[in-house]
């Protein structure tokens, strides 16, 4: 909201794209919800059934989103946008994937039925969504605190720094998962 309330100060970099405030806000919302829509299409498709393919594809899309946000918005806003995408996906994963699968499973148990194929598919989607949330946690925290460290975002290759830090933090999370 802060970035939208004063878009000319926070969101817009006129040397990149000479947006009006309304244009920048509309582009930002389209970028955010468009990214979430693409994620949902992938997670619900056959590509979302294989954790490796799914994770690889999401990583590639996040690299593209990182680069794209750096082309459109101020450097600082770019980091915040990637964090907002991660956060939106994480919330969507819980409300539109994990919780419905949990409800379906609990309903089967309450009725004394064995979960069928549909519930199994929901459970697989929920597992992959939960895995994404697990790996997105540290990169999300990094994007949240990044505004306090201009040396991370205040140059033309800041989008690449964002990608590398995302890889490093996700790798750290993977290491932690394997050891605990």
State each model region's role.
Residues 1-180:
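Polytopic transmembrane helical bundles with strong interfacial aromatic enrichment
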